[in-house]
Amino acid sequence: VVVAEGAQQLAAEQSARPLSAFFGLDNNLPFGANVLCLGASGEDGMPVVLSHTVNPDSLQAEDFRVVRQSGAANTPMCVTLRPAGDMDENRTVLLIGEFGNADDDPPVKVLIVDDVLSDATDSAQVNFRGTQVSVIPLDAGPEIILAAAVPKDIWSLSGRGTSCPTATKQVVRVTWTGGVRLPNRDELGEAQRTLYKVSLTAADGSRSEVNPAALAELGDADNNHFLCLDTTTPATAVAFPAGHLVDPNGDLNAD
């Protein structure tokens, strides 16, 4: 996955659209999801990753419609930017409700049918209304959907997750299509740090590959990781091998 120079570059390089819609859980959101939305326990969960960060005040459940294989359509019970709620993360919208069953009438498409606005302050605000994306099936594994450099004034803030070491020189945020953990449900550790590969491109065009010096943004149950680097040579791509992490449904990650 190519690393963008930041949220501004991501916004400038693509039109407003959903990048992914991931059928994460089918009638299986845990009891704790009631904190996100009263009555969410036992419902479906579908994180939708957007091309731009969005204005939370423009989000309403009625802005989204989930279409099933049969053609039937549902409006979510609720939508939320949690748990991916730290600074500059507000592009993953969790849809909660009844979106069909994986085995007989699965969801196939998410439509944005009303105004969902970007939170741009230094560029033109964009509207996601009229856009759509195909749904990634329940039994598919999670994958990295985007990666972007994080400004120091953001990564140096303390958020809900763990922080990069103070000696960190550069941070890349990796966003997955859905939340990921180890197969035993533990958080990522040292072994997974060494599985992340970051490509660097120097000013003279020479390239090299490193592992992150540390992983951060852990422990907050969202779909973002910080790759903390101890070099100032710009990061230009990120990779993580298949088969090491699982989504909440227990499906192993793809490449």
Label each PLM-derived region with a short phrase.
Residues 2-255:
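Non-catalytic beta-sheet/beta-sandwich ligand-binding modules that flank or precede catalytic cores
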